Amino acid sequence: MKYYIIAGEPSGDLHGSNLMRGLRKADPEAEFRFWGGDMMAEVGGRENLVKHYREMSFFGFVQVAMNIRTILGQMGDCCRDIKAFAPDVVILIDYPGFNVKIAKFAHGEGIPVHYYIAPKVWAWKEHRVKALKKYVDKLYIIFPFEKEYFPTKGIEPHFEGNPIMDAIAQRCAAAPEESVFRAENGLDERPIVALLAGSRVSEIKANLRFMAELAERMPERQFVVAGVGWIAREQYEIFTKDMPVKFVCDKTYELLQISEAAVVTSGTATLETALIGIPELVVYGIPWLYEKGKPYLLKIPFVSLVNLNLKREAVREMVVYKPSVDEAELELRSILIGGSKREKMLADFDELRSIIGGAGASDRFAADIVQTIQNSKFKIQN
């Protein structure tokens, strides 16, 4: 069968590539056409990559407004390409600002729409639920608490676990020995605190300087920034200049594996850190106006996916206008080896793994997609 897949971010590229491997297992004759990145291209062939996510990375109102003509042009290109390819199914991976509109188009063309990794409408832009209900034939969720949320909105989702477990299993299994990793990346023998300041320039700007200030307080530890390749290193160095921090790029899982603890922004990274088993402090600097309006704007009790899945504050969240370095230092020291909160947090992470489920979710989701489309075709033929 023919699969048209759209991912607009690095995480979507990762999960899309694993899903494509699963689709090929379930359907050896699978044909792919996709929007994504290098990892998806490795599986589906670079000749079938329509657009790289680097050309689609517009975040926030200002960036979107400045690039609206480009975005609308890309949507038009995508719709025309879908029509020309005539897929058996369109698979959308998160990225709702773009993908919800593509869902409407594909639905109008009579093409089945499967949304893999549902948009986080439970956190913001809940109005998108109406479009999901109207235009999406099957919604795939990756967080257990979503099993309770979506039925209240009239949508029966499908859950097979979380593909993050597949990504972690693959990367950690292939990671080099700790001594080799330290030598290759210029890291000394001091215990490591990983700094995950975000995957967007705006997040780096909001969080990294504060994180680096912690390094000045704790010279007995080695603070290492987990950078991402699509952000120029200079963007990090603006906020770490003359600060005692080190830098590695595109090696977040490998770095976390050998870290004593981590300071992490909100988002998927909080969950990844916990599933790898590294105690963490969640810090996110927000605008003053947003802090004042947070009680009215935020629809969820926590911002960390760890806490949302456990339904309690297992990791400390400091989501404020100006986080206190003194307070953050105390919290960080409490989760280091010998700290008062470390063992309880590690036990909570064990519980989290049991809730999320083990590896293999990508294959299970893929098998369900193939079976669903095949069943649909059989009904039409008969």
Pin down the residues of each PLM region.
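Nucleotide-activated sugar donor-binding and catalytic core shared by glycosyltransferases
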Residues: 1-382
